[in-house]
């Protein structure tokens, strides 16, 4: 949505200073062992914002050692009441509310995110996620089991231990809290590696974590690159679990490293090529808008993007016309500027990849309805692009684009569209638009997706589990299921003289 459509959004901060640029270990700020730093940029202007300490294997080792020490039996963190963990998470949410404007401005400057979206959606989601996780802290519990014989048996839900958490660049702060919220609620300690493109809000969170009162070593933040710092976390022999959100290609490397090291637990939220199916009986206005937001939100840089749009033949032409009309309404520019409705892609690498895929669509015979190229003289901007007459064998129909590119395909029958929708390596999410409840239930059951939305799209909440089928990953984040990823179940059996019912 455009900034002008959003109510109650203050102006972003000006002359923002980036105070926290070092590595956060044991509630203290450290320079990198190597002495190296790396630059952080504004993708809208291509200007350097600051330099950040570049963590690598030696820094990860220090962070893991601190996390392990904080997790020792008898430590302040391990002996803390579960309800107190919840209080600390709520305190952290309070501090995010206090720094709401600063963090939203930082997300827009560093991540190219529309300021209004950062302020309302991302920061709002961050606060709700933490409060949800805080509420679970003293409700993660075991059971008693009526085992045969004279025994008393019960289970304990114990924290996994030291958790490595590798964060993507598209939702830097929200994904940071999706990771640390459940982990800390369950009593784990964490070593977090933010994406090298967007480390600034994560590092600011280090200061808030210390201010909230978390003991030293419970949360450690090591900015750095994937092949060095990320690889060190994935292969570390003293990391008990790693959680990663990002590309399927990197997810495979992380799982391989986990298997070759200590068989640490792994949860992965990876890529997607999500189908969105619009039947002829759907509310067309609703379907057009949700499908549009489903692929163009945050410049298309969403793992759940509705990037394969299947429209029933009888309404296809009208749907394409309305979709093109909607895409042409975008105003591109600096995401901090009021009235702008589309910002830049995150960096040059993504920018060039998207433009290459757009060119492939043109060459392979898709009809370019609008957009189709770069925009402006500075920054990584790409025109909102709509293709029609797309076929399933085209690259734009198969590969994850991660950009503002909508491809619209035609279908004739229910059985045909189910088969085509499932014909992908991915299985993260899907959408269905129909006013026929029988059709909605039938199709949602048939789709191989971790999440299916009916007559809506991209509706995500802390109360609901999120994750993918197939090569979109494994494990779940958030909801009650998400906490299982951060606990181990221990069975305790005690011999007693006599058991009574």
UniProtKB/Swiss-Prot annotation:
Assembly information from the UniProt record: Homotetramer. Interacts with PRMT3; the interaction is direct, inhibits ALDH1A1 aldehyde dehydrogenase activity and is independent of the methyltransferase activity of PRMT3.
GO molecular-function terms, A-Z: 3-deoxyglucosone dehydrogenase activity; acetaldehyde dehydrogenase (NAD+) activity; aldehyde dehydrogenase (NAD+) activity; aminobutyraldehyde dehydrogenase (NAD+) activity; benzaldehyde dehydrogenase (NAD+) activity; NAD binding; retinal dehydrogenase activity
Pathway: Cofactor metabolism; retinol metabolism
Function: Cytosolic dehydrogenase that catalyzes the irreversible oxidation of a wide range of aldehydes to their corresponding carboxylic acid. Functions downstream of retinol dehydrogenases and catalyzes the oxidation of retinaldehyde into retinoic acid, the second step in the oxidation of retinol/vitamin A into retinoic acid. This pathway is crucial to control the levels of retinol and retinoic acid, two important molecules which excess can be teratogenic and cytotoxic.
Places the protein is found: Cytoplasm, Cytosol; Cell projection, Axon
Enzyme class: oxidoreductase
Keyword Phosphoprotein applies: yes
Cellular component per GO, a single term: cytosol
Record-stated family: Belongs to the aldehyde dehydrogenase family.
Annotated site, Transition state stabilizer, chain positions: 170
Protein name: Aldehyde dehydrogenase 1A1
Domain of life: Eukaryota
InterPro entries registered for this protein in UniProt: Ald_DH/histidinol_DH (IPR016161), Ald_DH_C (IPR016163), Ald_DH_CS_CYS (IPR016160), Ald_DH_CS_GLU (IPR029510), Ald_DH_N (IPR016162), Aldehyde_DH_dom (IPR015590)
Native source organism of the sequence: Bos taurus (Bovine)
Residue numbers binding NAD(+): 167-170, 193-196, 226-227, 246-247, 269-271, 349-353, 400-402
Keyword Repeat: no
Residue numbers carrying Phosphoserine: 413
Tissue specificity annotation: Expressed in muscle, liver, small intestine, kidney, brain, lung, heart but not detected in erythrocytes (at protein level).
Enzyme active site: 269 (proton acceptor), 303 (nucleophile)
């Amino acid at each position: 949505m455009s900034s002008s459509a959003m109510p109650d959004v203050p102006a972003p901060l000006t002359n923002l200073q980036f105070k926290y640029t070092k590595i956060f270990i044991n509630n203290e700020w450290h320079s990198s062992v190597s002495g190296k730093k790396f630059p952080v940029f504004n993708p809208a202007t291509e200007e350097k914002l600051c330099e950040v300490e570049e963590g690598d294997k030696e820094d990860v080792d220090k962070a893991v050692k601190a996390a392990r020490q904080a997790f020792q039996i008898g430590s302040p963190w391990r002996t803390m009441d579960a309800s107190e963990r919840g209080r600390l998470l709520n305190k952290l949410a309070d501090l995010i509310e206090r720094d709401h404007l600063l963090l939203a401005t930082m997300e827009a400057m560093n991540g190219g995110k529309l300021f209004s979206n950062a302020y309302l959606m991302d920061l709002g989601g961050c606060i709700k996620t933490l409060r949800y996780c805080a509420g679970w802290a003293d409700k993660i519990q075991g059971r008693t089991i009526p085992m045969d014989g004279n025994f008393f048996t019960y289970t304990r839900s114990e924290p996994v231990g030291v958790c490595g958490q590798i964060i993507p660049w598209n939702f830097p702060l929200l994904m940071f809290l999706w990771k640390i919220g459940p982990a800390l609620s369950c009593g784990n300690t964490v070593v977090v590696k933010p994406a090298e493109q967007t480390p600034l809000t994560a590092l600011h969170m280090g200061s808030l974590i210390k201010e909230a009162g978390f003991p030293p070593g419970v949360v450690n933040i090591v900015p750095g690159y994937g092949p060095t710092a990320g690889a060190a976390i994935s292969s570390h022999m003293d990391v008990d679990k790693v959680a990663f959100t990002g590309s399927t290609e990197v997810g495979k490397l992380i799982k391989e490293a986990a298997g070759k090291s200590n068989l640490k637990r792994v949860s992965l939220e990876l890529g997607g090529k999500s189908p969105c199916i619009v039947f002829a009986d759907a509310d067309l206005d609703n379907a057009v808008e949700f499908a549009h937001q489903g692929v163009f939100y945050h410049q298309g840089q969403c793992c759940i993007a509705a990037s394969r749009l299947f429209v029933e033949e009888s309404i296809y032409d009208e749907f394409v016309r309305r979709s093109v009309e909607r895409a042409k309404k975008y105003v591109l520019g600096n995401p901090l500027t009021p009235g702008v409705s589309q910002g830049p892609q995150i960096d040059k690498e993504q920018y060039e990849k998207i433009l290459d895929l757009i060119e492939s669509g043109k060459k392979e015979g898709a009809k370019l309805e609008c957009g189709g190229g770069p925009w402006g003289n500075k920054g990584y901007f790409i025109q909102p692009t709509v293709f029609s007459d797309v076929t399933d064998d085209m690259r734009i129909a198969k590969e994850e684009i991660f950009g503002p590119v909508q491809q619209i395909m035609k279908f004739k029958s229910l059985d045909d569209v189910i088969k085509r929708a499932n014909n992908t390596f991915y299985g993260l999410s899907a959408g269905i638009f129909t006013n026929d409840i029988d059709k909605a239930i039938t199709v949602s059951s048939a789709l191989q997706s971790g999440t299916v939305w009916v007559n809506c799209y991209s509706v995500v909440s802390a109360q609901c589990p999120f994750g993918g089928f197939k090569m979109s990953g494994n494990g779940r984040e958030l909801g009650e299921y998400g906490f299982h990823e951060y606990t181990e179940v221990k069975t305790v059996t005690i011999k007693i003289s006599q058991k009574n019912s």
